[in-house]
Design a protein with these regions (language model features):
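Conserved anion-binding
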Residues: 12, 17-23, 98-172
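Short, acidic/polar
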Residues: 28-40, 84-90, 144-155, 207
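Conserved, mostly hydrophobic/aromatic
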Residues: 8, 39, 47, 92, ...
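Active-site-adjacent beta->alpha loops and helix N-cap segments on the catalytic face
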Residues: 3, 54-70, 84-90, 104-126, ...
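Catalytic cores of alpha/beta
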Residues: 73, 77-99, 181-217
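Conserved beta-strand positions in the central sheet of alpha/beta enzyme cores
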Residues: 48-51, 78, 101-102, 126, ...
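N-terminal beta-alpha supersecondary unit
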Residues: 14-60
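Short, well-ordered coil/turn segments that N-cap beta-strands
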Residues: 1-3, 43-46, 73-77, 97-98, ...
């Protein structure tokens, strides 16, 4: 199972929000490049980079942070937050992202997202299925829809989008453990999915459990910044899995 460390960006700073609440912000580092280099030095290969300013504004804002990290590391980066137009997708790829992370647009403007799939290819997108009580959440979790998450996942699997990450809004930023039952249900329904767990991870035990139920990868954020899981331990886990 691949470990994907997360960097969330507000005003160029490395931050974390609790449950997507912009009022519950913690600034961890003012230099995201330094953080990314620490991940790379620990042998991690991927990076989940989130533009929280963009997510709130509905347009890409922190593309220069992406450009800097992509230009000065060899990390395989997925980047998302506020991507609403084809121009934004192009900016993300031009700035060095390997994958564009898609969330709200796949729910609110399916035709637009379908056109991006046709232009760039389904393999270039990392689809976020953020959920609360098995319903899709959008706009940085500020809005809970009536869309069933299983229907949502199936729709885009049928369109050949195979990399999907799922964040349980009830768990994120709380370090209370991942939603194992939820993820098991998803993996049982969609065994061919490259499924990435996200939210609530607080220990190596959590990562072992996610690996054991069949997750392809796990996004780890707050647990790193709060020193619940050291980079040394992540490096060891990564090298033996």
């Amino acid at each position: 199972m691949t470990i994907i460390p997360a960097i969330d960006i507000i005003e160029g700073n490395c931050v974390r929000l609790e449950q997507g609440d912009y009022k519950k912000i913690t600034v961890y580092d003012k230099n995201p490049l330094d953080v990314a280099r620490q991940f790379e030095d620990a042998g991690l290969k991927r990076l989940h980079l989130v533009d929280l300013d963009g997510a709130k504004a509905g347009a890409v804002k922190n593309w220069k942070v992406l450009e800097t990290i992509a230009g000065k590391t060899n990390l395989f980066i997925d980047f998302g937050g506020g991507i609403k137009t084809e121009k934004d997708v192009q900016i993300v790829f031009d700035s060095g992202a390997a994958l564009t992370t898609i969330g709200s647009i796949a729910t609110e403007n399916e035709n637009e997202f379908r056109s991006w799939i046709q232009k760039f290819g389904a393999a270039k997108f990392f689809l976020g299925a953020d959920v609360k009580n098995e319903k899709i959440a959008i706009h940085g979790w500020q809005k809970i829809t009536d869309i069933d998450m299983y229907d949502f996942i199936k729709k885009y699997l049928d369109k050949k989008v195979t990399q999907i990450f799922c964040t349980d809004v009830n768990k994120d930023g709380k370090l209370q453990g991942p939603s194992l039952d939820l993820y098991k249900n998803i993996l049982e329904r969609f065994p061919d999915l490259y499924f990435v767990a996200s939210g609530g991870i607080s220990s190596l035990k959590d990562l072992e459990e996610l690996k054991n139920i069949g997750c392809s990868a796990s996004i780890v954020g707050k647990a790193i910044y709060e020193n619940k899981i050291s980079l040394k331990k992540l490096e060891l886990f990564n090298s033996t899995n």
